Amino acid sequence: MVKNIVDLYTRAVASFGETLQHVSLDSWEKRTPCDDWTIQTLVVHVLSGEVQLMNLVEDETYSSPELSPNILGPDPMSTWRGTAINAIRVAQDTPLGKELPHPTVTLTLERLLGARITDNAVHAWDLSQALSLNH
């Protein structure tokens, strides 16, 4: 049973990671259902969202996300796992009502987690479609 939004976030991140495990080295340039996005573009987008969550909570700064493939490093799955684990830890250790800096909206951790849940869940499905997996 899901107790709270942090549990939902953890499950959404895990779902994306489980799907990401199926990406082979020759799959990164495959198209996704997202217009003009490859698997690599999609993974960079989701990964940078988790990095942004940590920046907003820990550093209390908003910066434009890094959308370069370089963010994936030499082992994208290891990069994902480490980033996901750290983002989940930050979410678990931070009060949901904490206000976060953002240039356009009043943002709390709870609202940000709602957005991250949606992003991970939707893009796990997009990724599964690009890989011809059932999701």
Q: Which residues does each predicted region cover?
A:
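Surface-exposed helix-capping loop/turn segments at secondary-structure junctions
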Residues: H22-W28, D93-K98, L133
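An N-terminal domain-cap segment
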Residues: M1-W37
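Amphipathic, well-ordered alpha-helical segments in soluble domains
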Residues: A12-T19, G49-Q52, T83, D119
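Amphipathic alpha-helix face/heptad-repeat signature
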Residues: I5-A12, P76, W80-T83, L112, ...
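Short, contiguous alpha-helical
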Residues: S27-P65, T104-H135
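Short, helix-capping/interhelical loops that line the mouth of catalytic, cofactor-
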Residues: M1-N4, V43-P103
